[in-house]
Design a protein with these regions (language model features):
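N-terminal pre-catalytic "stem/leader" segment of glycosyltransferase-like enzymes
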Residues: 2-63, 67-69
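P-loop/Walker A phosphate-binding loop and immediately adjacent motor/lid segment at beta-alpha junctions
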Residues: 14-20, 78, 85-94, 141-148
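Short, flexible loop segments at the rims of nucleotide/cofactor-binding pockets, characterized by
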Residues: 36-43, 74-76, 102-108
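Hydrophobic faces of well-ordered beta-strands that scaffold small-molecule active sites
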Residues: 60, 96-98
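Histidine-centered beta-alpha loop that forms part of the nucleotide-sugar donor binding/catalytic region
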Residues: 63-64, 100-103, 131, 150-151
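Short, flexible/disordered intra-domain loops and linkers
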Residues: 67-80
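Membrane-proximal helix-turn-helix segments that form the acceptor-binding/catalytic region
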Residues: 80-95, 104-126
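Donor nucleotide-sugar binding/catalytic pocket of nucleotide-sugar-dependent glycosyltransferases
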Residues: 121-138, 142-151
Length: 151
């Protein structure tokens, strides 16, 4: 079968909410994106797609909440828009994954802290890179679904 032939398979569509790969010096998200793509999942790495696209994604994966809203965001309206976008994608069947890299950034303002709260509580599953993070998160959010993937 060549690339032009249609199949009955519906590929999973995933979005990693992170700036476009060519615009980063952080290799975590690009490597993750490439590894996921190798499994046959249709994945893209884009912050703009989260805010502007109407694409129906199956999975939306958050990395750093401050990456989603802006690293030094001081616009209180971004919180309303974040909640709207999550509702929009969820209404189209999206499931949310959050990789918890940090408990909170060292210098988070109220808007960044609120973005963390929203993403933490709205994610269907939270990925942790260590047991301390998973235990801490489960204590804060007893109903959460958590998985540890050591790195």
């Amino acid at each position: 079968m060549n690339d032009c032939e249609e199949t009955n398979d519906k590929a999973i569509k995933a979005l990693i909410v992170f700036r476009e790969i060519s615009d980063t010096d952080n290799l975590f998200a690009p490597i993750l994106c490439d590894a996921i793509r190798m499994t046959g999942i249709d994945v893209r790495c884009s912050k703009e797609a989260f805010w502007e696209s109407d694409t129906a994604y199956d999975i939306i994966h958050f990395q750093w909440p401050e990456e989603v809203v802006g690293w030094n965001c001081d616009d209180p309206d971004v919180i309303r828009r974040l909640e709207e976008r999550i509702r929009f994608f969820r209404s189209r069947g999206a499931h949310f994954v959050y990789t918890r890299h940090n408990v909170r950034p060292h210098y988070a303002n109220d808007i960044i802290s609120r973005a963390y709260d929203i993403i933490e509580t709205q994610s269907d599953i939270v990925v942790h890179m260590g047991h301390f993070s998973a235990d801490d998160f489960a204590a804060r959010y007893p109903q959460s679904r958590n998985v540890v993937i050591l790195h």
